[in-house]
Amino acid sequence: MLDLIIKNGQCYIDGELKDVDVAVKDGKIHKIGEISEEAKEIINAEGKTVLPGCIDTQTHFREPGSTDTEDLHSGSRAAIAGGITSVFEMPNTNPPTSNMKEFQRKLDLAKNRMYCNYAFYFGATADNANDLASLKDLEGCCGIKLFAGSSTGNLLVAEEDDIDKVFQNASKVVAVHSEDEAILNVNKKLIKEGDVHTHPVWRSAECAISSTRRIVRIANRHKKKAHILHITTKEEIDFLSQHKGNITFEITPQHLTIYAPDCYDKLGTYAQMNPPLRDKSHYDRLWYGVRNNFNDTIGSDHAPHLKENKEKTYPNSPSGMPGVQTLMPVMLNHVNDGRLTLHQLMNLVCENPVKIFGIQNKGFIKEGFDADFTIVDMNKTIEIKNENIESKCGWTPFNGDKFKGTPTHTIIAGNIKMQEGKILGDPDGTPLKFS
């Protein structure tokens, strides 16, 4: 007997929507097509779209060190509530995930506590080059995280010689927070206390493009893969579109949905993140990049902080906002608005993450692959509210906003983990495997 059949839905297969049923057995996709066998469970997906399980390649779940704000358990609940079946989680915790002992500790903390599948970045420091050379076969390791500019945590690697050493020794993709620390320090004098509108003045477009040019130069010199996170400027879009190959890059849903000065007028320090939300000329260029398939991934940069901290006077307010639960509704709404196609979105949250990072058996609806699915209703409009946010932070920059298109089911290894907003079953996610 089969474990699960998903019937009557339109399945995203080989870049097209196909009217086929999908059978699941032992956590794998058993058969695609007409299913005559019986199953323990049947989902009637009539009127819905069955997608491969969607992957968020940039999240910060704050454990260890800041578990009042988020932890691996609560962050994973937010993920499955938003139709995300797998996450990559960041190393800027306290202590940071920058040695083998702390990496193993994080794997131990995740076991039987995370609902979704997971992998962790290994944090680069100025003096852990030997570790970076031996990560190729480390279980649950998706890549190396390099902070070239200071942000939350203390994993800064700002000097060119040290950045060079990271790439020289890298045995995995290096994902980069790309801001120029020297420019950040010079620009500090431009900060106006109490005025978050000066956040993108301090963390300027020049600060971003200067760093990104340097990262690309160093990565290419060593013939290593660099994945530039949360690109925010028109200059970077134009530059990176000419430097593909070993270089890939991400844009966040936030930077494709809200922009300055409106976001700071409306949200104040709740709109503060690094790199910042910028003006409409940058926003428009980011969309130009998406339409032309320049960017490779969409990652949420889920980086929650408690309200009491976000409401501190700028610049004492921390940078970051939640996003893993809202990534799919926000982007599906953009699909419905014609800003990008469903095919493009599937490249960004399923297929490209698999190709860039070498994730095994994910990202496609294929026989023999893992039975991870995100079922969505493209016609259902939801209002996102703070009280429905699963993150411990309890807020979202999209509070009160309506989005058309939303996940209705999150299925992992053939088990329904979220159905119509309700979280089901046990937290039994497993580490992702990489080739």
What spans do the regions from the language model cover?
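A glycine-rich helix N-cap at a beta->alpha junction
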Residues: 108-124
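Divalent metal-binding segments
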Residues: 60-69, 88-100, 120-131, 147-158, ...
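C-terminal cap of metal-dependent C-N hydrolases
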Residues: 9, 313, 367-433
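Histidine/acidic residue-rich metal-binding segments in metalloenzymes
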Residues: 130-298
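His/Asp/Glu-enriched, well-ordered alpha-helical/loop segment
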Residues: 197-223, 292-298, 303-376
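Histidine-rich, glycine-flanked metal-binding segment
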Residues: 1-52, 424
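Divalent metal-coordination and catalytic microenvironments
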Residues: 9, 22, 27, 47, ...
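Metal-associated gating/positioning segment near the N- to mid-region
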Residues: 46-113
